[in-house]
Each structure stands twice: as structure tokens, then as C-alpha cells.
């Protein structure tokens, strides 16, 4: 299976820069997109041979996730079942025959770590969601986790320490 996960940071701009050419060229079985920044009806992608699943944020121009897959899933879930989080369009889950595929755009803690408490609540709730899925069958998680695990993951680790996504 060929799976591509990509934070597009605005799908409309990405389409203008050749997304569809890339999409056709790589011919992946599954595309998981994060930070689509779309509202329903803002874009109509013609992707023959793919099923499309979109989760939009209520806030215009904010977050959003999507999965395009050649194989139709058994079921689809949007969000993680926690109202506090689900209005931001951060998760799409496909139930395939042998596994769950979860596309996620994890919240950023923001400058000055203003949203760190929310992020920690998100982490607990998302972990519980994944553990619940894992009790039934395997889970594949892909997406933008908004975290740098080690200094090597950052261009400027010293100046980024204690910034969103890189805290002790």
C-alpha cells in the first residue's frame, strides 16, 4: 500500500501550485491531508478512482483534514467523539477491513504556549480514542502531530526551545 500524508497548509493554494499533477504522478492508494483550510463547497476536486472524505473546521480558513482512498472503507468517522475538539475538523478515521486509518492535524500550543493546557487535554482525549480503536483492530495514524521529538527535527532548535511543539 502506498500512503502519503501531507500538511498542505491550505489546499486551494496547493492546487494552484500543482497538487493535482503530483497526485496523479505518485498514484498513491491513500492520501491523507492536513490543514486543508476549507469550508464545504469551496473546492471540488475531480479525483477519478478515489473516495473522498473531508472534515471541515467550523472556523473559516482553519485546520481541516481529508482522506482520498482508492478502496472504499467499511465506515467513516469524523472527529474523536469529544465536542470540545470535534468542531476544529482535525480527525478523519476510516475503518478498513484489517485496520483503522486515522488522519490527524494535532492542535498547536501557539506562541507563548497559550494553548498548552488545551493541547494536553487533546493529547489525553486523542490517546483514549486511539486506544479504543486499537482494542478492535490495528491502527495506522498519520498526519501533522505538531511536535518535534528531538533537536534534529528542527532547523533552529535553540531558538525554538519552549515554543509550540518543542517543550520539555
Name these PLM-found stretches.
Residues 37, 42-109:
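Structured beta-strand-rich core segments of catalytic domains in phosphoester-bond hydrolases
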Residues 1-9, 98-110, 142:
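Active-site-proximal beta-strand elements of phosphoester/diester hydrolases
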Residues 40-42, 62, 110-113, 148-157:
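Short catalytic/ligand-binding loop motif for oxyanion handling, primarily in non-cytosolic enzymes
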Residues 51, 125-168:
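Metal-dependent phosphoesterases centered on the DNase I-like endonuclease/exonuclease/phosphatase
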Residues 7, 23-41, 101, 130-151:
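Active-site beta-strand/loop signature of hydrolases that rely on acidic residues for catalysis
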Residues 81-82, 107-123, 158-163:
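Surface-exposed cleft-lining segments at the edges of enzyme active sites
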Residues 17-20, 117-127:
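Conserved CoA-thioester-binding segment of acyl-CoA-metabolizing enzymes
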Residues 1-47, 57, 62, 78:
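N-terminal, active-site-proximal structural segment of metallo-dependent hydrolase catalytic domains
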